[in-house]
């Protein structure tokens, strides 16, 4: 699982790790070592004892996430949001979107992209044009997976209702 976005990468990585490591042996990127040195160092620690890896991918320009994705070959890609970080180098949020979308460059038909359904630029990605599965997650009806009734419990975690089509779950993390 690889994660990128303008904000929230490390928190998202740590939350995914917390959930998965309750059942699986999972390797994760330490801290925010998410560049072309730090992420490959994490992968060097990946051996057969691990069932999964959760990798953070950062960038400041075009081609950087592509290099990381070529190394990691994720089966699941998460994009948290498209903000203004690195706009001075990339020129526009649309270009930031293009750079972040590089995380999906090596996806095959068995891969899943999970995008923030509350982000207008990410919502511009059309599902029917992709050779892999795309799911939007958010708090609005635009999302495929919707979180409602969110309660932040401080150090105790977070609770919310999750809706996927006609199915609902009470989630507590």
Can you describe what each PLM-predicted range is?
Residues 93-94, 127, 131-173:
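Adenine nucleotide phosphate-binding catalytic loops in nucleotide-utilizing enzymes
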Residues 1-117, 121-130, 164:
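Phosphate-binding loop of NTP-binding sites
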């Amino acid at each position: 699982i690889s994660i990128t976005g303008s904000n929230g990468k490390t928190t998202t990585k740590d939350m995914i790790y917390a959930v998965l490591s309750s059942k699986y042996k999972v390797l994760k990127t330490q801290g925010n070592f998410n560049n072309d040195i730090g992420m490959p160092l994490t992968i060097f620690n990946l051996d057969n004892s691990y069932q999964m890896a959760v990798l953070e991918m950062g960038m400041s320009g075009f081609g950087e996430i592509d290099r990381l994705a070529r190394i990691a070959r994720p089966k699941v890609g998460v994009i948290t949001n498209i903000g203004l970080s690195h706009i001075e180098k990339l020129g526009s949020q649309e270009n930031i979107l293009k750079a972040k979308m590089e995380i999906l460059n090596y996806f095959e038909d068995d891969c899943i992209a999970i995008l923030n359904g509350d982000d207008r630029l990410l919502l511009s990605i059309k599902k029917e044009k992709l050779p892999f599965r795309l799911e939007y997650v958010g708090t609005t009806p635009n999302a495929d997976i919707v979180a409602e009734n969110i309660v932040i419990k401080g150090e105790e975690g977070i609770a919310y209702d999750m809706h996927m089509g006609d199915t609902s779950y009470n989630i507590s993390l």
